[in-house]
Curated annotation (Swiss-Prot):
Protein name: RGS domain-containing serine/threonine-protein kinase A
Alphabetical keyword list: ATP-binding, Cell membrane, Cytoplasm, Kinase, Membrane, Nucleotide-binding, Serine/threonine-protein kinase, Transferase
Organism encoding this protein: Dictyostelium discoideum
Family classification: Belongs to the protein kinase superfamily. TKL Ser/Thr protein kinase family.
Catalytic reaction(s) noted: L-seryl-[protein] + ATP = O-phospho-L-seryl-[protein] + ADP + H(+); L-threonyl-[protein] + ATP = O-phospho-L-threonyl-[protein] + ADP + H(+)
First-tier enzyme category under EC: transferase
Length: 1125
């Protein structure tokens, strides 16, 4: 070619050979000693068709010449697919400067393409590595191929590989010259005159027909002093998209080039290149190459100075890239990374938009010239010293470009981007559906914020709410009764108050501390030394032994002290532990008890305060809840302040006979004082009229959203109107009569008084006994629902509610219909029962589990570990907002030690979340099946008792769980039972139930067959859980193909082990009876289990538990434990 002649003539100049080398390298992409082979391919329709295509080839499919196409025989292929991180780690490794270090030939199997692509290698074992076979480091130009016997299109067997320079008559440098040149210039020249930086291992692996287009990948290992910039890879990954193809999850510098006229590949080549390495040489139009060569020849003949060499480079750039610049044409300032770390795009005009954006970072050489760029010449040229400084650059146009390259490198590093990990694009981790703030574990400090002391900063709104709440708490007067040790001793001494306090502990907390205190109290009364020793051992076994179910939380030093005193027990041996627990009980449990409805004294004080402040100013003792026919005590309660803004004042009447008394509603007249009685009645009537007007005026109320809601108080209004009519009759009867008819007048007024008493009693019943229904009819007057509890005196279901403008709560009685109505009002958002929490106040730590019902995360709220359950249309398979509200309502208003308490709930867009206390030991299902957990028989009884107590409380609240199973029972760090998942819970109503609710293995037979079932379905589920607890196995084989509903409906049950304790097997059999009425209630189950766990308590109460547990008398409604004879 003309190029070779001009190249020899221009060696006298400094760097003219640079251009000639660049021009000659246009057609040497196929010149890597025939190491790779290719075949003509057509686009496959699926990835499976790739197995028949050899994808290790040169860029254009040329095997032995610069034009034309070659083919190779197919064969058994294997795919290598590794992660992207493997590829990154490979690039970051130090350069292999000795080719003998490779124990396998290129392409090296430990290197993969990443990005979901595969390298297809020949299944034949490779030949032993020989230095002469290395296409880069070897200078002999071996014609052998690593692919074995590859047949070209022209014939079979191995064929020698010839470069374009050899075919055109160009004389190549010999091995010694090239090796010397490599040593001096720290560069390597291959047989095709391609120049590579020493220490850079380059392999060209064209990927064919993946994603409906052929691609070429060049992977290389850059030297350690030039690490790869991963950020640019991420930017390529994020922006790269190729039409009509599968999505590219990563691409390293792809650009499209027109294929050679002689190539058989129809689709455009997509060239992928790593950073800081030499790009692939693609074959371009020969006409353009010849033009470039002629330009370089003319320039080289006219260049005699160093600056002429720069003009030569400028000419090349002007003809190809239209970059009319000086030395800076070879480099372009980049704001993202240095030129060593930037991809090089060969054809920016035909590349996709994302490629054009990134290709602007680098100035390429001519469009038709796609050669490696570091230039060198023979030793006689004298140009080596001028080009050594340009090794850091991809393109070195002249010896004078070193300064411009340095300037570019300085400009490149102006903006340093923060390193980002690749998990954002190449990770299978679930993203958080709600942007909770991350938990700052690495800081190890708690962030102080305005709303709480936690890991999350609060906003201004939460701070304002907190200040309002604290201000409101300061306004509320403290309870009159104080929690002191003397008061506590007095409480547990009285049997009535002891039962009330025990009921409070059962509903809110555990009874270990209280039971220990009572046992020690009994222990101190024993005088017999033998009995004292026996009682001491029993107390140790119950409260201090490591296997004790009711073990106390005390220090090990105190346990050792008690253990040492067991040999010679004294009455004072438990004093240290008793003082410690006494402080805990008084400061925690007893303090909450004295201000709770369980305390009879607090209830009486509350009634007095409520009556004096709201209804009357009298100083007489008033009992609002007891109505008698005696008119003197006829002081009935009235609706809250919301119904009437002005309370009725007592009329001042002079009673000579003390027969007339004032009332909120009416006052009776006296025959001996007609005028005064009439005035009193008229005064009371005027107050009633005023009250009636106030009630009618408040019938229209506006809520926070500006929507008007009417208040329906027809019952109250009708009673008030009837009372007013009675008052008017009383006044008319007491006036206009003569003194001689006083007796008749007295009878008339007495009748009116009786009418008043009857009407007052009816009103009292409406307000006290059945008034909660009226509250539900106007739910906007409810400020907060505090809790629902069982009254310890009359065992009646009660609810504590705070009404608008009231500081103290009001207690109402409930029935099943009221409970159902309450839940419906909560679902309608008319009543709020939970604490509203902003997602920014919750910090998230880690993912726990995901399922069809939502996702669960572990996080922190106000410095406490919480479980965060996230639900929503995008998170749940079947999301029901009403079910979510119902679950939050039940978990918020029910307070029990064995029920998971909802700490609050919130919303973010269309996703919802609620917080519960975090249970470290997971579900009971997984805990039982983990064989590493050593679970004693006592611990299993503890599990059974905790579940029974929680379900006893739920059933007492008229709630059916309907999905009771071991997966919905969690264990805290101290293995305390917590029942969760109240989404399917319903108010006990046997006439309106949904069939097939729950999990089949735990479902009662009546659920499959009928819609009319009761709370006994939970008892059946409890029997299956007992089977799991005491066998540590599933009730039904999970792998067996069995029809559980048919088995259950036929009366078939899991087989109980023969070595199971009789007391346990009997209760299981009784709980899964086919007929629901034959199953025991949880009240009886709890009593029986407690008699097993606490035999000394049962003995001290005079009760003995039945050993058979199969007697029908014990389950037919009688008490479970029978008294001693």
């Amino acid at each position: 070619m003309k190029t070779s002649k001009d190249s020899s003539n221009s060696n006298s100049n400094n760097n003219n050979n640079n251009n000639n080398n660049n021009n000659n390298n246009n057609n040497n992409n196929n010149g890597l000693n025939g190491t790779y082979s290719s075949k003509s391919l057509s686009p496959p329709t699926s990835p499976k068709q790739m197995s028949g295509n050899s994808i290790i080839s040169n860029s254009t499919g040329n095997l032995s010449s610069g034009s034309g196409s070659g083919s190779s025989s197919g064969g058994n292929k294997k795919f290598i697919n590794r992660s992207f991180n493997t590829f990154i780690d490979f690039i970051k490794k130090p350069a292999r400067r000795n080719s003998k270090a490779h124990n396998t030939p290129p392409p090296y199997p430990e290197v993969d393409t990443g990005f979901g692509y595969f390298l297809e290698l020949d299944s034949k074992p490779p030949k032993p590595f020989d230095e002469k076979d290395d296409p880069i480091h070897n200078s002999t130009g071996s014609t052998d191929s690593w692919e074995g016997d590859l047949n070209s299109s022209g014939g079979g067997g191995k064929q020698p590989q010839q470069t374009q320079q050899q075919s055109s008559g160009e004389n190549l440098n010999n091995s010694s010259d090239r090796n010397n040149n490599s040593n001096e210039n720290n560069q390597i020249v291959d047989d095709n005159s391609n120049v590579f930086n020493k220490g850079v291992v380059v392999q060209t692996v064209p990927m064919t027909e993946i994603g409906l287009f052929p691609v070429s990948l060049m992977m290389a290992q850059q030297r350690a002093e030039h690490p790869i910039n991963v950020e640019d890879i991420e930017s390529d990954v994020q922006t790269c998209s190729i039409p009509n193809s599968k999505p590219l999850y990563s691409s390293l510098g792809c650009s499209t080039n027109s294929s050679n006229s002689g190539s058989s590949i129809s689709a455009p080549n997509i060239t992928f290149q790593s950073f800081g390495i030499s790009p692939v040489n693609n074959n371009n139009n020969n006409n353009n190459n010849s033009n470039n060569n002629s330009n370089s020849n003319s320039n080289s003949n006219s260049n005699s100075n160093n600056n002429n060499n720069n003009n030569n480079n400028n000419n090349n750039n002007n003809n190809n890239n239209n970059n009319n610049n000086n030395n800076n044409n070879s480099t372009v300032n980049s704001n993202n990374s240095s030129l060593n770390n930037s991809p090089r795009y060969l054809n920016s005009s035909s590349s996709p938009r994302s490629m054009q954006h990134l290709s602007s970072k680098i100035t390429t050489t001519t469009t038709t010239t796609t050669t490696t760029t570091t230039t060198t010449s023979d030793d006689n040229n004298g140009n080596t010293n001028n080009n050594i400084s340009n090794n850091n650059n991809i393109i070195n146009n002249s010896n004078n470009n070193s300064n411009s390259n340095n300037n570019n490198n300085n400009n490149i590093n102006n903006t340093n981007h923060k390193f980002k990990t690749m998990e954002k694009y190449f990770s299978s981790k679930e993203n958080f559906p709600i942007p909770f703030p991350k938990l700052k574990d690495e800081l190890g400090v708690i962030i102080e914020n305005s709303s709480n002391k936690g890991y999350v900063g609060g906003n201004k709104g939460s701070e304002d709410r907190r200040k309002k709440i604290e201000q409101k708490k300061k306004q509320v007067p403290a309870p009159e009764m104080k929690a002191t040790k003397e008061k506590f001793i007095e409480t547990i001494t009285d049997p009535t108050t002891l039962n009330s306090f025990r009921s409070f502990m059962e509903n809110t907390q555990s009874n270990e501390n209280l039971e220990f205190f009572l046992e020690v109290k009994r222990f101190n009364t024993i005088q017999d030394q033998v009995l004292l020793k026996h009682t001491c051992d029993d107390i140790w076994r119950r409260f201090f032994d490591d296997l004790a179910v009711t073990q106390l939380c005390v220090e090990s030093s105190l346990k050792k002290l008690i253990n040492n005193r067991r040999e010679n027990p004294t009455h004072s041996m438990f004093n240290e532990v008793l003082d410690l627990l006494l402080d805990d009980i008084v400061c925690d449990a007893f303090r909450n008890y004295i201000s709770s409805p369980f305390n009879p004294e607090w209830k009486s004080e509350f009634k007095k305060k409520f009556t004096n402040n709201t209804y009357s100013t009298t100083t007489q003792p008033i009992n609002n809840f007891n109505n008698t026919n005696n008119n003197n005590n006829n002081n009935c309660s009235t609706p809250p302040n919301n119904y009437s803004s002005s309370p009725i004042k007592q009329s001042n009447i002079n009673n000579n006979n003390n027969n007339a008394s004032s009332s909120n509603i009416a006052s009776s007249s006296n025959v001996n004082n007609n005028n005064n009685n009439s005035n009193g009645s008229n005064t009371s009537s005027s107050h009633h009229r005023e009250r009636l007007d106030n009630i009618k005026g408040n019938r229209e109320r506006v809520d926070s959203n500006g929507k008007e809601r009417s208040i329906d108080n027809k019952d109250i209004l009708s009673l008030l109107e009837s009372n007013l009519s009675n008052h008017s009759n009383s006044s008319s009867n007491s006036n206009g009569k003569d003194k001689d008819k006083d007796k008749d007048k007295n009878e008339n007024t007495t009748d009116n008084s009786n009418n008043n008493n009857n009407s007052n009693n009816n009103l009292n019943n409406l307000i006290i006994k059945n008034n909660f229904n009226n509250i539900l009819q106007s739910p906007q007057i409810v400020s907060k629902i505090n809790e629902i509890f069982k009254d310890s005196n009359n065992s009646q279901l009660s609810i504590s509610i705070t009404l608008d403008n009231d500081e103290d709560p009001t207690i109402f009685h409930l029935d099943e219909s009221d409970m159902e109505s309450l839940i419906e009002e909560v679902v309608k958002d008319n009543i709020s029962v939970h604490t509203e929490i902003s997602y920014s106040d919750v910090s998230i730590h880690k993912w726990i589990a995901s399922g069809s019902s939502g996702r669960v995360y572990n996080g922190q709220y106000k410095g406490k570990d919480v479980a965060i359950k996230v639900l929503g249309p995008e998170v749940c398979v079947h999301f029901d907002l009403n079910e979510f509200k119902r679950e939050v309502a039940l978990m918020s208003i029910f307070k029990h030690d064995n029920l998971a308490r909802c700490l609050g709930a919130g919303q973010y867009d269309d996703k919802y979340f609620h917080l519960t206390e975090y249970c470290h030991n997971g579900s009971l299902f997984s805990y039982l099946r983990d064989q590493r957990n050593n679970i004693s028989f006592g611990q299993r009884l503890h599990f059974a008792l905790g579940i029974a107590r929680g379900m006893r409380y739920l059933h007492s609240m008229s709630i059916i769980h309907r999905d009771l199973k071991s997966m919905n029972i969690l264990l805290t760090k101290r293995l305390k039972i917590k029942i969760v998942d109240f989404g399917t819970s319903r108010v006990a109503n046997k006439y309106n139930m949904t069939t097939h609710v729950g999990t089949q293995a735990w479902m009662a037979p009546e659920i499959f067959t009928s819609r009319t079932y009761t709370n006994k379905v939970d008892v059946y589920s409890y029997a299956i859980i007992l089977f799991e607890i005491f066998t540590r196995k599933s009730a039904y084989d999970e792998n067996a193909n069995i029809n559980i509903p048919n088995m259950v409906m036929k009366g078939e049950r899991p087989e109980l082990p023969k070595d199971m304790q009789t007391s346990i097997s009997n209760i299981i059999k009784k709980c899964w009876q086919q007929k629901p009425s034959n199953r025991p209630s949880f009240i009886k189950i709890v009593a029986y289990l407690e008699s097993i766990i606490y035999p000394s308590v049962s003995n001290s109460l005079g009760l003995v538990a039945s050993t058979s547990f199969s007697s029908s008398a014990l389950w037919s409604g009688q008490i479970l434990a029978q008294p001693k004879n």
